[in-house]
Amino acid sequence: MPAPIALQLYSVRDQLAKGFEPVIRQLADIGYVGVEPAGFPGTTPEQAAKLFKSLGLQVCSAHSGLPLGDDKNKVLDMAKTLGLKHLVSGKGPDDFKTVELIKKTCDLFNQSAQVAEENGLTFSIHNHWWEFELLAGKPVYKYMLDYLDKSLLFEVDVYWVTTAGANPAAIVTELGKRAPLLHIKDGPCVKGQPMTAVGDGKVDVPAVAKAGAATAEWMIVELDSCATDMLAAVKKSYDYLVGQRFARGNK
């Protein structure tokens, strides 16, 4: 059976800011099984959790800061309120410029994973293109695998992997059970250009779906920006992924 489909709510951040509940209801009406929050524009985690529950929407995961230092309690409280299993975060390109910086960044990730585990959660790293650039002839993510604890998971963003010139299906296969969350997005795979509905761009989505068939827990649509109407693209992405049986929806 295909993994259930969710939407990263960053995709509809502008719409949510104008009216959180109507947009979430629209996502449920489309058939999305779950959502992945990244902030709560115009609402609170408590209010959002009640709305999600009333609509039967699962919270597959959430993007947040690292559960460390001053942010620790805030992140953990949010996770408890939403009843989620997976915490997801990442770092910017400047944190991976040298091997020493990669080590320091991975140490923060390892600490985050330990805090997550102590609180019954998992911690996943969300990638962009810079984790797949070369440093001294070696992809940055390969250094990361050297320094990361084996309990640490990944949310593979297949669009940014493709944009970096790497093969997303091969990455998903390589990571296996360490990649339970897949960010499915599509477009021209050119930095700075708007994305498209899933199925309308250059990402080899069928290959990704096949690679993650046995290991992906969630297929999460995310469009950072879009060349067409965002909510229309969100629905078209759902129709494509569920219609091709690459993901499982509620309709």
Regions from the PLM with identified roles:
Residues 47-54, 108-118, 171, 207-211:
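Catalytic-core regions built around general acid/base machinery
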Residues 1-11, 49, 53-62:
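Mobile, glycine- and charge-enriched loop segments
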Residues 25, 34, 58, 65-154, ...:
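Active-site acidic/histidine proton-transfer and metal-coordination neighborhood
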